[in-house]
Structure formats: C-alpha cells, structure tokens
A protein has these predicted regions:
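A glycine-biased structural micro-motif
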Residues: 46, 86-89, 136
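Phosphate-handling substructures
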Residues: 66-123
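Acidic, His/Gly-rich catalytic cores of divalent-metal-dependent hydrolytic chemistry
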Residues: 183-189
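GST superfamily/GST-like fold recognition
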Residues: 145-149, 174
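Short beta-strand scaffold positions
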Residues: 53-54, 122, 142-143
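Generic beta-sheet signal
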Residues: 4, 49, 135-146
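Active-site-proximal alpha-helix that buttresses catalytic centers in soluble enzyme cores
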Residues: 2, 7-71
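Domain-level recognition of soluble alpha/beta enzyme cores
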Residues: 157-182
Length: 189
C-alpha cells in the first residue's frame, strides 16, 4: 500500500492583492503562501516520499518547502483558463457577464478558449500514472486546486476544491485509490 499526498500550492502573490483566475498564469507564492508551504512541510518532514510538482512557479515553490528532490511533470499544471487566464474576477464579470453568471450555478460550463474538464482530467490522471510508475513507495503531488478538484470529484464524487496549502491524503492499493479518512470510498486506477 502506498500513500499519496495531494498538495495544493500555497496562496499566490496576487498583483495588487486582487484575486484572479490563474489557470496557467505563473505567479510566485505570497508570504502567507510560503508560510503555508513551511507548515505542511513540517507535517511531512518524517515521511519518506518522492515529490512531483507542476512546473508553475507557485507549485514549485511549495514543493521546495519539502526539501527533497523534485520531479517536474508538465501534466500536473492547472487547467488552462483560456481567455479568463490572468484576469481579475471583476474584469471577468465585466467582459463576460453572461458566462460568469451562468458558471455561478454550473461550474461545468466551459470557459472561452479554455481546456475542457475532460481533457484536463485525462491529462492529470496520466500524470498521476506517470508519478506512480516513476517512483517506489509514498509520493507527494504538488499542484493546483482546479485540476485536483476535477480528479477528486470524478473519483470520490462530492468534493470541494482543496484550499491553499491543503493536503489530501489518499492510499493506493491494488489499483485503487482510497481516501484515508474514509476507506469505504475508492477508485480503480
């Protein structure tokens, strides 16, 4: 049995403190985000793990807090947000009012020019499979909330986007993922 720690990067350093739709926008961590990374690294300091990370800076900086070699996997990147990538939510509300309002009720409505949820999920699952094949024992996957939420929702149904710096612990046994806190729910991989 292997333990997999899915770790969402810490809080990014948003320009002028305005939250934005990040997608592939490459921001560093804020001071709070660096602290979040150090906090979770403390919790994992005695764990023997292989660390995999998205290539985006906020994920790499988070992974660096673990003080272990990092294997970068391109397919761990966040979903592309298309035309919304890098825009503040106020800019999105102004430029795309109909889609913004509709997505408040249904997050499956695609963003203009963005990667589809299906393509993103397939990409992330391929990255998870690659990480499993390239490592022995336990591993940490440092990445992004949107893509992780898709994976978790697809396999465990009711799941919210992980918070900044949050760790989700899964067990992997005989081709299935099991939520550590609820071993009744599992997914074959």
């Amino acid at each position: 049995m292997r333990t997999i720690y899915l770790i969402r990067h810490g809080l990014p350093d948003f320009p002028l403190g305005q939250r934005m739709c990040l997608g592939r926008t490459d921001l560093p961590l804020s001071q709070e985000g660096l602290k979040q990374a150090e906090d979770f690294a403390e919790k994992l300091k005695n764990q023997e793990i292989t660390v995999f990370s998205s290539p985006l800076l906020r994920a790499r900086q988070t992974a660096e807090a673990l003080h272990r070699p990092i294997i970068i996997l391109e397919d761990l990147q966040e979903l592309s947000a298309g035309e919304w990538d890098g825009l503040t939510f106020q800019e999105i509300r102004t430029r795309y009012p109909e889609i913004y309002a509709a997505r408040a009720a249904d997050k499956t409505i695609p963003l203009p020019g963005a990667e589809s949820n299906e393509d993103g999920l397939k990409r992330f699952e391929n990255a998870m499979q690659t990480a499993m094949e390239q490592s022995q024992g336990n591993l940490a996957i440092v990445g992004h909330g949107g893509i992780m939420a898709l994976f978790l929702k697809a396999h465990f149904r009711h799941w919210e986007k992980p918070g900044y710096g949050q760790i989700i612990t899964l067990l992997y046994d005989n081709g299935r993922f099991i939520k550590q806190e609820d071993s009744q729910k599992c997914v074959h991989f």
